[in-house]
């Protein structure tokens, strides 16, 4: 695995259209569970005023005046304008995701069940309050389901929305944690984690979002294009029209790959692919 190609071995080869499920006939017990999931999800949204910012590697504009990254896909620095939106302060947890699966009449993911029942390890990271790791399509369907049942335009974030939010409104912040500082594992003031912890275990970034630097990665709505920044439109960019992998953002495998500008990618049908959070668009 490289820092920028966040790929796992297990792949679920299911057509995207088959995953666009709808609610089964819900029981009297499930109806309030459904409404609770929807209400909690939207109550956890953080309002983010839109604005204009410079997206990409801004290292030449600050401090040492040198690029932060050697990855050419983070360049050129380019202007982006975004409308107001809301973003979930937490990644969706296994507890939330598995409740959603049950509402669809679906079983827990096969690999999740195998690991959960394993006698080799306790797999703490599969606990209900830990970030879920799912395929891109399941993540997108989950977010759109929230929108369909709440009358709101809910989806996965675009890559531009995510970077703008991680940088707390597009500021020149290279780390998405609470103080824009790198803290090594032995540092008692460390405020992010490279491995799994319950969602929201560390302080949020300045606008109130948790785990934008560590504790996994987030799926983006966008297809990945290594040269996309060369032709990205300024207004609310949505990514390339097509591709083979989807963008992921967050902790990508090393301290050098925790930057708010770092771009990763993963196959959208990877079953245990990435974490995710939803956005609400106007």
Question: Whereabouts are the PLM-identified features?
Answer:
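Bacterial N-terminal signal peptides that target proteins for export
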Residues: 2-10
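Compositionally biased, low-structure terminal segments
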Residues: 4-5, 17, 256, 277
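Bacterial N-terminal signal peptides
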Residues: 10-18
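Intrinsic structural disorder/low-complexity segments
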Residues: 11, 36-38, 180-182
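Extended beta-strand/loop cores of jelly-roll/beta-sandwich
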Residues: 19-160, 251, 263-282
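Functional-site microenvironments in short loops/helix caps that host divalent-cation chemistry
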Residues: 54, 58-59, 64, 118-272
């Amino acid at each position: 695995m490289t820092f920028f190609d966040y790929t796992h071995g297990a792949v679920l080869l299911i057509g995207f259209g088959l995953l666009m499920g709808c609610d089964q006939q819900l029981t009297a017990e499930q109806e309030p569970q459904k409404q609770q999931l929807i209400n909690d999800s939207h109550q956890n949204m953080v309002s983010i005023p839109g604005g204009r910012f410079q997206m990409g590697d801004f290292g030449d504009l600050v401090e040492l005046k040198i690029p932060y990254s050697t990855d050419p896909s983070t360049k050129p620095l380019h202007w982006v304008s975004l409308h107001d939106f809301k973003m979930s302060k937490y990644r969706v947890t296994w507890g939330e995701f598995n409740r959603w699966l049950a509402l669809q009449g679906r079983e827990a993911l096969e690999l999740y069940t195998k690991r959960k029942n394993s006698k080799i390890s306790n797999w703490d990271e599969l606990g209900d309050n830990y970030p879920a790791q799912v395929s891109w399509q399941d993540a997108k369907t989950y977010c759109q389901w929230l929108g369909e049942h709440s009358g709101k335009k809910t989806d996965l974030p675009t890559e531009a929305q995510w970077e703008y939010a991680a940088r707390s409104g597009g500021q020149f912040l290279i780390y998405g944690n609470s103080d824009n500082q790198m803290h090594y594992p032995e540092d008692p003031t460390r405020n992010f984690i490279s491995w799994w912890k319950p969602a929201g275990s560390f302080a949020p970034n300045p606008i109130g979002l948790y785990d934008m630097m560590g504790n996994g990665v987030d799926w983006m709505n966008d297809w990945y294009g290594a040269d996309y920044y060369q032709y990205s439109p300024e207004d609310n960019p949505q990514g390339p029209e097509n591709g083979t992998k989807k963008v992921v953002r967050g902790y990508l495998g090393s301290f050098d790959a925790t930057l708010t500008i770092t771009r990763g990618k993963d196959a959208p049908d990877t079953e245990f692919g990435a974490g995710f959070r939803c956005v609400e668009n106007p």
